[in-house]
């Protein structure tokens, strides 16, 4: 396939006739899946080559935000970069079947690469087409417009430089770091965990409709919904004027594997650039070794932070189980949420003091007792468990031993097992 593409390229090189490079997923080579687009273009008098041409070529794709994790996406990016550096007689068409997935990140990157070299992207969404005639009309319109450009040549504009956010080095070390809101059980503990590592971290508020609006404006509209919210939360924070871009950085977790979430960082960088916040570095927080984000100023001693993080995760998981088990049975509306927030706020002291198992187990006994009392599902042991752990140490009033009859209900089985 590569040799055939090379031969076609040599044949058209002498006359510089109009040529279209077709790029897409491997299954788009099937004529039925691609609706015979290649035949359609050939019948219009235009040569067709495929992205297989660049398989053996050394084409650098360092000037992109995309995290290159998949073979076919890397090939499409290389093909777009190669096409962008060729003459105007070689143009680019990308085929996609659905936007959600890597394609949502990829399309924007391909468009940026071509636009920097003063070329445009023609994107054909094959699964959105119910009438082949409309696609044929669009392809013909593209080809005719390119022929008009050849007939009326104009001065070629300069190639634009690749613009990205700054590298997080020691000059940015003292900046406040904003992190998206992940979960009401773990997010409140994140600032304290990273404070142990020496970083000033602040959670962004929970997403709302305004987050959606900003996310749709600065992220691909077919990207997965959480990505839209995360991008929207970050842009909304800066648009609110609450944070100074010159004194702030942004952090996002990455899975380190072949997951769309690993590319959230590329979406955030691109959104910050498009919104005009070019001085805000973006930090990747990941345990995976396959993620490369140049950030020499961000260094964490995981041996120091992991014990605190580990017990914080277990603690937040216990609160989540207690909360979801209690909220539908609570005697007083809203008490489960208040207890959740109270014990998450108090847990910050565990991280500040670097308390581990002993402190977290005491807390779990206390919150177990209070959650049980909030719904009357206890056999008279709640008061005893609450007394264990000396709540006054954490600034909590010791739970009083309530009357056994008041603490119990008619159910023979407590909602939660006793914490040992």
Q: Where are the model-predicted features located?
A:
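An N-terminal assembly and electron-transfer interface module characteristic of large anaerobic redox
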Residues: 1-420
């Amino acid at each position: 396939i590569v040799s055939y593409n090379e031969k076609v390229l040599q044949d058209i090189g002498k006359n510089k006739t109009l040529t279209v490079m077709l790029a897409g997923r491997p299954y788009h080579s099937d004529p039925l899946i691609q609706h015979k687009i290649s035949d359609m273009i050939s019948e219009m008098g235009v040569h067709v080559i495929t992205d297989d041409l660049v398989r053996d070529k050394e084409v650098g794709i360092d000037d992109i935000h995309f995290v290159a994790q998949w073979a076919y996406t890397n090939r499409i990016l290389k093909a777009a970069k190669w096409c962008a550096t060729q003459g105007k007689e070689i143009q680019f068409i990308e085929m996609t079947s659905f936007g959600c997935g890597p394609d949502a990140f990829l399309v924007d990157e391909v468009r940026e690469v071509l636009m920097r070299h003063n070329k445009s992207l023609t994107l054909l969404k094959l699964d959105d087409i119910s009438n082949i005639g409309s696609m044929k009309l669009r392809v013909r319109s593209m080809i005719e417009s390119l022929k008009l450009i050849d007939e009326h040549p104009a001065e070629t504009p300069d190639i634009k430089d690749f613009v990205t956010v700054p590298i997080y080095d020691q000059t940015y070390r003292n900046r406040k770091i904003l992190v998206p809101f992940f979960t009401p059980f773990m997010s409140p503990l994140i600032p304290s965990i990273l404070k142990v590592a020496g970083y000033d971290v602040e959670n962004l508020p929970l997403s709302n409709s305004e987050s959606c609006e900003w996310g749709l404006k600065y992220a691909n509209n077919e990207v997965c919904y959480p990505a839209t919210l995360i991008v929207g939360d970050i842009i909304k924070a800066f648009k609110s004027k609450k944070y100074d871009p010159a004194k702030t950085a942004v952090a996002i977790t990455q899975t380190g594997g072949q997951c769309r979430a690993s590319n959230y960082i590329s979406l955030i960088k691109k959104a910050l650039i498009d919104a005009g916040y070019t001085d805000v570095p973006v930090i990747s927080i990941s345990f995976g070794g396959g993620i490369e984000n140049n950030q020499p100023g961000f260094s964490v001693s995981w041996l120091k932070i992991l014990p605190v993080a580990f017990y914080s995760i277990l603690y937040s998981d216990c609160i989540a189980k207690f909360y979801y088990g209690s909220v539908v049975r609570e005697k007083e509306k809203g008490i489960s949420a208040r207890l959740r927030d109270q014990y998450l706020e108090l847990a910050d002291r565990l991280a500040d003091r670097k308390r581990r198992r002993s402190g977290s187990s005491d807390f779990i006994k206390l919150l177990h007792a209070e959650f049980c009392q909030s719904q009357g599902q206890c056999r008279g042991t709640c008061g005893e468990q609450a007394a264990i752990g000396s709540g006054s140490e954490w600034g909590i009033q010791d739970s009083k031993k309530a009357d056994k009859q008041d603490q119990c209900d008619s159910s023979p089985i407590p909602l939660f097992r006793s914490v040992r």
